[in-house]
């Protein structure tokens, strides 16, 4: 209720879920001193997003849907008031805007979060990718000296940095647009402001759970993360 369940055009589904608010990432080695609080005090891995209101309006060429939610985690002591606006056009395009306001409802509030952004699930068949942003390899806010702004091509699997111990990886900073799928059949996303991008064939939960790369369970969709902010590597 109050979530985008599917986005398809010409009979083909491109998105099967999302966007939804997200503050969690699979922990990295340098998160070892924060992990206990993140997981067992602030419960960032257990999000809850409650729909508060929905309004929609039909026009000649589009439908506009406005959704208000409250995003938090299990303890409900902190969270975000979220305003989603979807403009869905008859030509097969969709514009999405999300505004969030931080809210404290109790005494427990994390000093900082690993990420603030949205997550979406896309069609598994969309494995090719192109983006305009930092590349070609991964980059983070405190680790991007070797990255250069440009247009890059890859595959979803190749976006992964294969660490010996599975952890958060493959992030690209300052992305202005990206495409998954090829030029004739794909999903093109353009951002008003530069955002952080992760594309993966696995969820953060499966990455967190795995002890070795071969134990990472593949997802049934391409997982898309778009981050307003993503914490550094430390």
Spans of features found by a protein language model:
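Beta-strand/loop-rich accessory regions of lumenal/periplasmic or secreted enzymes
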Residues: 1-234
């Amino acid at each position: 209720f109050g979530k985008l369940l599917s986005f398809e055009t010409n009979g083909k589904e491109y998105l099967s879920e999302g966007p939804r608010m997200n503050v969690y990432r699979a922990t990295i080695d340098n998160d070892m001193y924060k992990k206990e609080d993140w997981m067992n005090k602030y419960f960032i891995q257990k999000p809850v997003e409650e729909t508060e209101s929905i309004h929609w309006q039909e026009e000649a060429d589009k439908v506009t849907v406005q959704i208000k939610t409250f995003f938090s985690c299990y303890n409900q002591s902190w969270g975000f008031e979220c305003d989603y606006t979807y403009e869905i056009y008859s030509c097969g395009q969709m514009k999405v805007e999300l505004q969030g306001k931080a809210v404290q409802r109790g005494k427990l509030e994390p000093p900082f979060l690993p990420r603030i952004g949205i997550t979406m699930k896309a069609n598994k068949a969309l494995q090719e990718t192109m983006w305009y942003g930092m590349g070609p390899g991964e980059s983070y806010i405190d680790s991007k000296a070797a990255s250069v702004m440009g247009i890059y091509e890859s595959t979803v699997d190749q976006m992964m940095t294969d660490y010996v111990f599975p952890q958060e990886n493959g992030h690209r900073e300052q992305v202005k647009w990206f495409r998954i799928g090829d030029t004739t059949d794909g999903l093109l996303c353009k951002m008003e402001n530069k955002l952080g991008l992760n594309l993966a064939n696995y969820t953060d939960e499966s990455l967190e759970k795995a002890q070795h790369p071969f134990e990472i369970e593949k997802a049934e969709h391409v997982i898309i993360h778009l981050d307003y902010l993503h914490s550094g590597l430390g």
